[in-house]
Curated annotation (Swiss-Prot):
Its EC number is 2.8.4.4. It comes from Chromobacterium violaceum (strain ATCC 12472 / DSM 30191 / JCM 1249 / CCUG 213 / NBRC 12614 / NCIMB 9131 / NCTC 9757 / MK). It catalyses: L-aspartate(89)-[ribosomal protein uS12]-hydrogen + (sulfur carrier)-SH + AH2 + 2 S-adenosyl-L-methionine = 3-methylsulfanyl-L-aspartate(89)-[ribosomal protein uS12]-hydrogen + (sulfur carrier)-H + 5'-deoxyadenosine + L-methionine + A + S-adenosyl-L-homocysteine + 2 H(+). This is Ribosomal protein uS12 methylthiotransferase RimO. Transmembrane segments: none annotated. It is found in: Cytoplasm. [4Fe-4S] cluster 2 binds at residues 146, 150, 153. Residues 372-438 form the TRAM domain. Residues 5-115 form the MTTase N-terminal domain. SMART domains: Elp3.
């Protein structure tokens, strides 16, 4: 009896990369390959890499090296793969190198070095494909690439311009996820609010209904499933205003992930980002008037070339007034190929780090203050896991997996992962909440 070929898989990077990995893993299983849990049990290994910032490049190169040392047969894909010379200069013995979102190229390389079985068992693959997330939540990628040319970013050079998935394809996948018991769908892309721009918002059909390829209509359709729908990577276009009433009405979660990046008009122009913080503050105020429960997550870059102390103080003033719920802050790091590398007046490393500390200290006060308001409230939570001490590790609508805070319920008797419960909040920290089941 012929041995079933086995493929090891290492997935690095962001949720978009994880979605690419899921597509490749689904194809591998559909063609009869087994997924090996360890290097020594695999006939070859696929490494899906990240290449966005220097630390990610280093992590990816280390992962490739480890796979080569442990197994010897490695196919590289993902964003670092778009810089093929970088991979081969360090690891010339890899079998093949492809870029991101390259399922067909990866499968071709796998076929070349590990021919597929003659009798694949397609029925071994669930309708929702192979998922890297827990069973109760899933990422739903609606597009690939980006039309923006932010000076600190090289995503368009790695993933190309915006290419929206057909609306019927996205909705069919969402329907399969909901039927399979997924309780939370996280909508991802490089620019979720640009969905359909490249197709001129082409009209599609789902279950006999006409549906426009556009973020608002997508949200309306996803809201029909009665599960959590969370929007990530939203660029602050004017039509984002249209989804706030959907959040107020409970069709999708009142949660917006909008990477504002900075508040100084000068710095934003250097970044080639929208440059009107007063307008942003006015919109945030309006959104909260329409939907008081709205939670806003954002990310910011400090120490960008040309950022002065005055620019940084303007940023601090912005976050104090905006009172965002969840915030990440990064010091600027040059990325090979980014046009920001050519900008004058780089900020010294010690100044970058000092500004990051000051920024996070201000935001910690804001986060703690906003979380204190939750004490005494009853929230619906989704259980991610029960830890070894019997505590339920949960999330509310305000918490995206892996990046936001958590809700802990210490007496988790009868609670199960992947289920919803009502919890009264009794305590908080700067980032997390503690509750008791109701």
């Amino acid at each position: 009896m012929n041995k079933t070929p086995r493929v090891g898989f290492v997935s690095l990077g962001c949720p978009k990369a994880a979605s690419d990995s899921e597509q490749i893993l689904t194809r591998l299983r559909a063609e009869g390959y087994e997924i090996a849990p360890s290097y020594d049990g695999a006939d070859l290994v696929v490494v899906n890499t990240c290449g966005f910032i220097d630390s990610a490049v280093e992590e990816s190169l280390d992962a490739i090296g480890e796979a080569l040392n442990e197994n010897g047969k490695v196919i590289v894909t993902g964003c670092l793969g778009a810089k093929g010379d970088v991979v081969r200069d360090v690891h010339p013995s890899v079998l093949a190198v492809t870029g991101p979102h390259a399922t067909e190229e990866v499968m071709s390389a796998v076929h070349t070095h590990l021919p597929k079985p003659h009798d694949p068992f397609v029925d071994l693959v669930p309708d929702i494909g192979v998922r890297l997330t827990p069973k109760h939540y899933a990422y739903l990628k609606i597009s690939e690439g980006c039309n923006h040319r932010c000076t600190f970013c090289i995503i368009p050079s790695m993933r190309g311009d915006l290419e929206s998935r057909p609306i019927h394809d996205v909705l069919r996948e969402a329907e399969s996820l909901a039927k399979a018991g997924v309780k939370e769908i996280l909508v991802i892309s490089q620019d979720t609010s640009a969905y359909g721009v490249d197709t001129k918002y082409k009209l599609g059909f789902h279950n006999g209904r006409p549906v426009k390829t556009r973020m608002t209509e997508l949200c309306e359709e996803l809201g029909r499933h009665g599960i959590w729908v969370r929007l990530h990577y939203v660029y602050p276009y004017p039509h984002v205003d249209e989804v706030i009433p959907l959040m107020r009405d409970g069709k999708i979660l009142p949660y917006l992930d909008i990477p504002f990046q900075h508040a100084s008009q000068k710095v934003l122009k250097l970044m080639k980002r929208p440059a009107n913080s007063d307008n942003v503050l006015a919109r945030i105020k309006k959104w909260r008037e329409i939907c008081p429960e709205l939670v806003i997550r954002s990310t910011f870059i400090v120490g960008f070339p040309g950022e002065t102390e005055e620019d940084f103080e303007e940023l601090l003033a912005f976050i104090r007034e905006a009172e965002l719920d969840r915030v990440g802050c990064f010091t600027y790091s040059p990325v090979e190929g980014a046009t920001a590398n050519e900008l004058p007046n780089p900020v010294p490393e010690d100044v970058k780090e000092a500004r990051k500390e000051r920024f996070m200290a201000v935001q910690a006060e804001i986060s703690a203050r906003r979380l204190e308001r939750r004490v005494g409230q009853t929230l619906q939570v989704l259980v991610d896991e029960i830890d070894d001490e019997g505590t339920a590790v949960c999330r509310s609508y305000a918490d995206a997996p892996e990046i936001d805070g958590l809700v802990f319920v210490e007496d988790a008797a009868g609670m199960q992962p992947g289920e919803f419960y009502q919890v009264e909040i009794v305590d908080c920290s700067e980032h997390d909440l503690w509750g008791e089941r109701r």
